[in-house]
Structures are given as structure tokens and as C-alpha cells.
Amino acid sequence: MSPWSIDSPGADINIGIGTREVAVGPRRPRWTPARKPASPAGPRSVPMPETQWFTQAGAFDALRAALEPEPDSVVPQAPRVPSRTRGVHIVLDDFWGNHAILRGDFRTLRAREVDEIARAHFVDTYGVDGETIVVRACVQRGGRAMFASALPRALVDGMREASASAGARMLALKLCLPEMLNRTLHSTPRANVMVVFAADALIQAVLIEAGCWACYDVQRLFAGDACDPAKVTLLAEQAFERCAERTTLRHEDCALGFYGSGIAVDLAALQARFASVTTLAPSNACHELEGGESFARHLLEYAQ
């Protein structure tokens, strides 16, 4: 067994948690010796039973199963040396949380005050108890906008407990959208842009005006929507209409960046409406994954 394989007792691993499956793969060390062979272990997936799709219980059970050694894996005898607990880095499908972009003057606020503003927003918007959510907020350079995310505390605690029960320690837990934004914004050609991320159960949009975060929008994708180009295109246009209400932007002034792995979209229709359209990931190819698989395998790259 390679020391970098998923089942190695001390190896850190990446986890992608979708709505219908959990994917697990080896984590690449930051510094790898030049002569060290690449790990032969690839990612593997653990599907949730259909009755547990979109449920925390299904995610917890699949996470525990994903962290267990494969039944047919053969672990050779190794010298008895102290080994550290496996660390897991988890990225969640955005279905499991909520996001928001808040505008204001945050320049003089401390991190705790910024978090409390974000918490108050989610409490007011969704009517939840502030103690039941875990909030993360990031203020954009310049201090005039904040990107905030919230996760149910029960989900965070459950992920930590499921990892611990399988002999692993949760080192990181994050939602996918902020990671996708960080990796795709440099590919957008204009200061005014709407970036659309369509994957699995959600179509999300982030509108940027003059280089500043302006608005966030999210809509649900239901069964069959991903393979309906007209539907996906309509949802993208509706997202712009809602976001643009808070700005002075028009379609013709705004570029569009579309990330739609496995999502069918009518790019020609979007190109006729927006100043330009940039495809940030393969689109116009509907890949309905067999066996109820979800977006989980794609999440692994954002856990690295």
C-alpha cells in the first residue's frame, strides 16, 4: 500500500460531500519528494440510499463508510512506529448551507463584529436561532462588501463526530462556492460580470459591479433541469434580473461567466443578451451520472 493511499493510517484525505453520495480521495502533500511515486489510489464514492438523499443522516452514514478501509484492500505488515490520526479536508455541496453578499461599510469593524452582522442576516432571513448556525464571513478588499456563509451547527458537529468515529480528525470543512469563486474570477474578462455556477441541485449566481461584490442569487435545480438547456438559460437570466435590481447594470454592460459541469445550456441565447460569455467549465454536455451519483467527485478538487 502506498503511504499516500486513502487507507494509510496517517495520510490526510480529501472528502467531497454531495447530496446523494460522498467521494473520498488522497490528499496531495504540499511538498512531495521528486522521486516519490504517485499514489495509485484514486478517488472512490459511497452512494447514499435513495431514501437518504438530501439528508444529514445520509451524509453522516456515507461519510463514515467512505472513511472505512475498502473491503478488498490489503494492508501489509509495517514496522510499529507512531502514526498520527488521519486528517480530513471536507468540501460540501452548497445545498448544505447558505450564502449571502452584504453591502456596507465594514472597514473599521473587528472580525467578531463582522461575523455577528452575518449571523444576524441569516437569523433574520431564515428565521433560525443564531446559536444553531456556524457563520464564516470574508470582507472584500476595500471594506464595502462581505461574502458570508452559514452552516447548520448540527451538520458541522455531525461531520466532526462521524470523522472521529472512523478514526479521523476533521481539519477543514467548507462550502464549495467560495472555493469556486476564488479559482474562476481571474478568468472573467470584465469588471462587470455575473458568474453562474450550475451543478447538481443548485444554480447560483454572483454579480460583480465595478469589481465589487454586488449580489448573490440561488435557485433550485430539480430532476431533469440539468438536461434542459432552455430551463438552465432561463434560470440564469432570471438570476441576473433579480441581482441587477440592486445595481445600475444592464445585460449589455455585463459579461457572464458560466460554470456548468455536466449542465446543458444554450450559450448562443446568453451571448445574445450579455456583453460576452465565458465558459469556465465544460457545458452543453449533459452527463446524468448513473446510479444516483452526485457532484461529490467534482468537489474533491476544491478540497485540495
Regions found by a protein language model. Give the residues of each.
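Hydrophobic/aromatic-enriched cytosolic interaction surfaces used to assemble or bind macromolecules
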Residues: 1-304
